[in-house]
């Protein structure tokens, strides 16, 4: 069931969060170094895109530790909502003393989770990201917030599941999978693959 699957994802996160401090710090430092190696770029090149099929939040945890901003399709802060807009939003700043020449903010990457996430939840017609701490024991207590209307682990947006043939060709997955070929065909887009 989705409840068992979400529990196994949370167990893997908890294993990292509760590991011996030296081992955890060493592993997270490797992750931070990896993420920052391609989050920085020259001002004329497009943002890097990170695509992952993973349901856990290890990349998000590493990005948070590194101070890396991840641009995904969620808008908002308290309970972000998924937007299918393809607007190419970015983060810029104006250097002191220079007007009219905004520059790209360093430490920003585009981020797409192709198969959903343990903290994505279907609420009526919307997809929300809930505030689920990294390494939490169970998702259920975090689904009891106002506005979630009797949500349970069965409403988590984790794929593939038994209904994947139908659901992955619908919102939000069709939008997420469109982002992949769009990023692949842009210039200066390196590929890093792992696993098999």
Predicted regions and their residues:
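A conditional alpha-helix N-cap/helix-loop micro-motif detector
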Residues: 24-31, 169-174
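N-terminal accessory alpha/beta regions
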Residues: 1-22
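Short secondary-structure junctions and interdomain/linker hinges
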Residues: 12, 16, 38-45, 121, ...
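Generic amphipathic alpha-helical segments used as scaffolds and interaction surfaces in large
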Residues: 18, 22, 46-50, 98-101, ...
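A short acidic-Thr-Gly-centered motif at the start of a beta-strand
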Residues: 31-45, 101-104, 178-186
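Extended, H/D-rich, highly charged conserved domains that either
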Residues: 1, 40-159
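Glycine-rich anion-binding loop/nest that anchors nucleotide
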Residues: 51-54, 112-118, 151-196
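A broad, structural surface signal
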Residues: 7, 33-36, 53, 57-64, ...
């Amino acid at each position: 069931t989705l409840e068992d699957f979400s529990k196994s994802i949370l167990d893997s996160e908890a294993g990292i969060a509760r590991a011996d401090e030296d081992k955890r710090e060493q592993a997270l430092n490797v992750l931070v170094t990896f993420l920052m190696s391609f989050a920085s770029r020259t001002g004329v090149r497009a943002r890097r895109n990170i695509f992952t099929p993973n349901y856990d939040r290890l990349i998000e945890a590493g990005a948070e530790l590194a101070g890396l901003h991840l641009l995904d399709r969620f808008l908002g802060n308290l309970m972000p909502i998924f937007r299918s807009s393809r607007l190419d939003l970015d983060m810029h700043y104006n250097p002191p003393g220079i007007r009219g020449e905004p520059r790209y903010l360093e430490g920003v990457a585009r981020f797409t989770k192709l198969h959903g996430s343990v903290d994505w939840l279907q609420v009526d017609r919307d997809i929300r990201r809930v505030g689920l701490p990294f390494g939490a024991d169970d998702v259920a207590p975090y689904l009891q917030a106002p506005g979630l209307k009797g949500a349970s682990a069965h409403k988590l947006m984790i794929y593939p599941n038994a209904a994947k043939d139908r659901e992955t060709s619908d919102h939000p997955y069709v939008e997420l999978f469109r982002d992949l070929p769009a990023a692949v065909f842009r210039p200066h887009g390196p590929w890093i693959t792992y696993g098999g």
